[in-house]
Amino acid sequence: KVIACVLVVLGHFFQSMVKSTIIPDNDLYSWFNKTIYYFHVPLFFICSGYLYQKYSRIKNILDWKNNIIKKLIALGIPYFVFSIVTWILKTMFAGSVNDEMSGLAETLFKNPTAPYWYLYSLFFIFLITITYKNKTNKMLLIAFAIVLKAIALLTGGVGIYAISTVMANEIWFVIGMCLTDIDMDKMNNRFVGMLLEIIFIVLSVVAYKQNITNGLVTFILGLLACVSVLWIMISCRRYNNRFMDYVAKYTMPIFLMHTLFAAPVRIVLMKMGLTNSIIQIVIGLAISFIGPICTAIVLEKTKYLEFVIYPNKVIKLLKRR
């Protein structure tokens, strides 16, 4: 989860740097940007699927309904709050931002903006996916996800964003669910993960140089990258890493707020004439992580304002009173 979050921040940050012409759009940037998009969002879906299967049990229609209500609140509140804030800021400062926004209703319901489209997509995946109870259910779920992915690859998706994003990403979510059945003690050799990572990097360079954009190749590369990252992280889980543990507590705030901090700081620095790429990168990346973490800490102290990030946590707190 931390790796995926860091890569999302890096992807959005360097895209903004290139669009602002602070750093050049060269081969190194283009390769890096293309490569992380093979797998950083799939990693998020895999993590979500794993947690869903591990901690949820959907046995009947009542369980499904209660879970959907819970997910609607948990995903919907931060989705709407931060999408609206982003829309307002980009509309007010249209001349200073890199991307133009469509109408508010279209942004919220038809074409969600980055990075919040992930929450939008995840809700619809929860809507159609139930936890499996046995091997038969598991195989049916895998077959369902494969069929959706195959249709997405063959057709390029449909005109409705919610359907297209579910077709493309259901497979990653189901892979995460299936990870709950894997004996992770057998994945204790981190060198296997490192070897897979090296193979992925080499293949990603080849794909970039040959300009390969085939959907199936992209999926295979993404799968290889996800397996390598997961293998490395699982094999290293016995080692205490305070930094990773600390950042893991704030992945949601970082995901939600990194662009809201990075973009204004970039604009202010440019207004001050500080266009040096090193200064922009150091300060921009620092605020992308420090800003959301500090905000989350402040919101946690106030308890109830934390509702915009963790609504179900605050609701539970209110019910105890």
Question: Can you annotate each of these PLM segments?
Answer:
Residues 1-321:
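Alpha-helical transmembrane segments and their immediate juxtamembrane cytosolic regions
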